Amino acid sequence: SSSAASDVYKRQPYAFTARPWELNKTESIDVMDAVGSNIRVDARGAQVMRVLPRLNEDINEEWISDKTRYAIDGLRRQRLDRPFIRGRDGKLAPASWDDAFGAIAAKMKKAKPQAIAAITGDQCDAEAMFALKTLFDKIGSASIDCRQDGAKIGGARAGYLFNSTIAGIDEADALLIIGSNPRVEAAVLNARIRRNWLATRLPVGVVGPEMDLTYEAVQLGDDVATLTAILDGSSK
């Protein structure tokens, strides 16, 4: 009904907050997952108001995930916008940048270089990571990484590139998913897989933990032995 549709619209973060002609529109790339969906960021002043998809047939077509569309709420309501220092009572308290950097410097001066390490976050920009790397080069520590889960990622491009084009999923006659959950990790990619499955009953095999996908899939196993069996043709 029209009233139900109106109620849904009112619950959108952008609803009734700005007029389209008030917004500055910036073309960008989504960083909420590894798909690289093409997006447009609409902002009023310094505040992001909404995120919309941009057409790119080879990547996201005209789709974006719910996470991409609504993650801006985190910028408004849940983002840390000031430093915090843990006091003697064990609780975090707001602090000035001078105090925060002073506390960091004091801790680092007391420690040996080989005892200092840093891990960058998923959303860190290149400039911040370069500054961190420069700092650690100065203090003589090589212990800096971006793998928060301890994953072993090889330096060869084949280790991190998608082995087929995203658009190629539409033409695939079989699909093997290894150690990934597209529904959670790449919703737009998952939508392409489901569309092909609905149209052709695409055979999908999974090597990894069991998961709740939006299409039928055969659980082949969850270890290296399964992959070896697939490669040598002995897999059932």
Residue locations for each model-derived region?
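A short, aliphatic-rich alpha-helical micro-motif
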Residues: 2, 169-170
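Single conserved hydrophobic/aromatic residue that forms the stacking wall/gate
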Residues: 1-5, 9
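Anionic-ligand anchoring segments at beta-strand to alpha-helix junctions in alpha/beta enzyme folds, i.e.
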Residues: 114-169, 209
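Amphipathic helical hotspot of TIR/SEFIR-family domains
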Residues: 183-198
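N-terminal cationic and glycine-rich segments that engage phosphates or anionic surfaces
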Residues: 20-22, 29
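Cofactor-/ligand-binding subdomain signature composed of acidic, glycine-rich
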Residues: 42-114, 163, 170-174, 194-236
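Flexible loop/turn segments at secondary-structure boundaries
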Residues: 17-18, 37-38, 48-49, 58-59, ...
